[in-house]
Amino acid sequence: QYAQKKKGLAKWVFQREFELLAQYEDKVCAEFDHSLFVSPDEAKLFRDRQPKSERTKVHGLLNGVDVDFFDPNGKFSDEPLVPSKPFISFTGAMDYWANVDAVIWFAKKVWPLILQQQPEAIFCIVGGNPSSDVKALAQHQGIEVTGRVHDVRPFIANAQCVVAPMQIARGIQNKVLEAMSL
């Protein structure tokens, strides 16, 4: 999927990385009794590449969330960076390519439409190690980039909306489960 989104040298690098990683994964799968994946969909993608003799060893797990930690009635810390105006939040590691792609896409394609209706709204991008492309989004009207925060829960619980506009990642994202829990 990454290769399909890129051009030129980056496309070649992602495609080559996929090919090498696939060879390695196939070799490792043959050496173990079971292979576990983060979702049934991910397991199916891998299973479909395997010889029939290896397919029964491949299993998908379901994501979960700590419902005690992400309890809407629980207490969480005061977080000084939580906007005082209505806001939309995105949470995640902001040096992970799929998250970077998601917030850039949202900022370009969706955020201007929201600002037309709610000029005072804030898009709060929450997560450690924001890339330079993510930091640059803070120059746009209504976009705040927090970087790493002590407690992500206030940014989820107090948001009018939590978005996960992932264009690439497969499976259920933990950020979605956390938002639904709160």
Where in the sequence are the language-model features?
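Glycine-rich, N-terminal phosphate-binding loop of Rossmann-like dinucleotide-binding domains
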Residues: S39, G92, M166
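Acceptor-binding helix/loop patch of EC 2.4 sugar-transfer enzymes
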Residues: Q1-Q23
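Acidic donor-binding loop of glycosyltransferase active sites
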Residues: D33, G142, A157-G171, L182
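Short glycine-rich, flexible loops that bind phosphorylated cofactors or substrates
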Residues: K44, W97, R170-G171
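A short, active-site helix/loop in glycosyltransferases that binds the activated sugar's phosphate group
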Residues: A22, D26-K57
